[in-house]
Amino acid sequence: MSLFSFFKNEEKPSSAARAKERLQVVIAHERGAVERPDYLPQLQRDLLEVIKKYVDISEDKLDIKVDCIGGLSTLEVNVELPDS
């Protein structure tokens, strides 16, 4: 190892590689937004209202996810209940 190689900067990814990586992130994000059903926000509000009839919770305690894998759609509902 020479003295000059010790102080040499590590190779940085090219701007094209960085742009490609950023584009992949944007495309993945938009694909996720496109696959989101239109009824999901209303479903979340309706579920929150039903749960509020029995338990006092805020909207941030309810999380709803819809996944579609191979033609099979799944609905995942997570509710954080307060301690009694």
Swiss-Prot record:
Concerning InterPro entries, the annotation shows:
MinE, MinE_sf
What are the protein's UniProt keywords? Cell cycle, Cell division
Query: Which Gene Ontology BP annotations are present?
Result: cell division; regulation of division septum assembly
**Which Gene3D superfamilies does the UniProt record give?**
Cell division topological specificity factor MinE
Record keyword Cell cycle present: yes
Role summary: Prevents the cell division inhibition by proteins MinC and MinD at internal division sites while permitting inhibition at polar sites. This ensures cell division at the proper site by restricting the formation of a division septum at the midpoint of the long axis of the cell.
Q: Which family does it belong to?
A: Belongs to the MinE family.
**This chain belongs to which protein, by name?**
Cell division topological specificity factor
What is the scientific name of the source organism? Desulfotalea psychrophila (strain LSv54 / DSM 12343)
Give the gene name.
minE
